[in-house]
Curated annotation (Swiss-Prot):
UniProt-listed GO biological process terms: DNA replication, removal of RNA primer; mismatch repair
Highest taxon in the source lineage: Bacteria
Major localization class: cytoplasm
A Gene Ontology molecular function term of the record: manganese ion binding
Top enzyme category: hydrolase
Identification of the protein by name: Ribonuclease HII
Residues holding a divalent metal cation: 23-24, 115
Length: 212
């Protein structure tokens, strides 16, 4: 079994010096943004608890979020909201969020480890890794940053639209959420391209990622 730093070590051996892991959260929900994160960790970094954010409890993710913020050399976050998702489709929106996350880094990486199958539209050497959040500490760290950042955005949206209980479902298509859509229609952050019946939208206030 390979270690969580295998792909990082491989990149260092190939001569790269600044490696960023990139991952996203929120491709599947019916509402809210897709959020991506890019994380540059120190050379040789490891942490026994850092893994795919989906395998962690909310409390554990929050604790590891603070650990990663403390230990990382640089963190970048990209957010693409639902109107853009509807306009360009979820895959392109995800890749756009990933590119924004890399551009948001305070240090320019020379190599990217990207979760999934698709390369980011940036002129930087990169390797895509299916299930990379379980195989790379850099990608796993990015998955935690992306997930916690998105959850916090959805908590803000919950205060604007409490009838959908975004605090609990984070925009995913739970039974409760679908029933709320049937009862209240769409609000402004719902993804119209995700085939959920639309009624009159409500107003939307802008969410600032740095409000939390």
């Amino acid at each position: 079994m390979i270690g969580m730093d295998h792909f990082e070590r491989e990149a260092y051996e190939d001569g790269y010096r600044v490696i960023a892991g990139v991952d996203e959260a929120g491709r599947g929900p019916l509402a809210g943004p897709v959020v991506a994160a890019a994380v540059i960790l120190p050379h040789g970094y490891s942490h026994p608890e850092i893994t795919d954010s989906k395998k962690l409890s909310a409390g554990k993710r929050e604790k590891l979020y603070e650990v990663i913020k403390r230990d990382a050399l640089a963190i970048g976050v990209g957010v693409v909201e639902s109107p853009v998702i509807d306009q360009v489709n979820i895959l392109r929106a995800t890749l756009r969020a990933m590119a924004e996350a890399v551009d948001d880094l305070s240090i320019r990486p020379d190599f990217l480890l990207v979760d999934g199958l698709h390369r980011i539209f940036l002129n930087i050497s990169q390797k895509t890794i299916v299930k990379g959040d379980t195989l790379s500490v850099s990608i796993a760290s990015a998955s935690i940053i992306a997930k916690v950042s998105r959850d916090r955005i959805m908590e803000i949206y919950h205060r604007q639209f409490p009838q959908y209980n975004f605090l609990k479902n984070k925009g995913y298509g739970t039974r409760e959420h679908r029933e709320a859509i049937q009862n209240f229609g769409f609000c402004k952050i719902h993804r119209r391209s995700f085939k959920v019946k639309s009624t009159k939208p409500q107003s939307l206030q802008t969410v600032n990622l740095f409000d939390f």
